Amino acid sequence: MEKQEQQKVSRLVFVLIPFQGHINPMLQLATILYAKGFSITIIHPQFNSPNSSNHPEFTFIPISDNLPKSQVSAGDLFGIVSALNKNCEGPLTECIQEMLKAEDPHDRISCIVYDSTMYFSQSVADHLKLPGICVRTSPAATMLAFAVFPCLHEQGYISFLGKV
């Protein structure tokens, strides 16, 4: 029986958030899917970029995040996440549109796989009529915390700004 070279016939675009504990799970998933025959493109903000030399089989594309150094150095995690979601939507849309223009029919974009913290990615996927898959890179125990928040709010233990 002849061993045939596996041809990559479909591309997955991964959108990473540049935080510890989020990059590795996404790259691990990308590695598994690469082994199953998918081509992988990693799109990431310029801030805290992953080391592309650790995964030479992937295509890494940085996009502008327009994060001011003062915001990053202040360590305001929620502010950084909010700014990334606001600032990266346009650059991600432009990047994927360019990929679609140059698309090889044997290497078409099948899906955008994104970290749940980069929630703007679904809007980009919808706009470009591509499927989007949201991946929660947080431990399963955090799901329990999210489930309990409304109850804690109702009992007056915590409060939220705006609607819950």
Features from the language model and the residues they span:
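Glycosyltransferase specificity loop/lid
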Residues: M1-V164
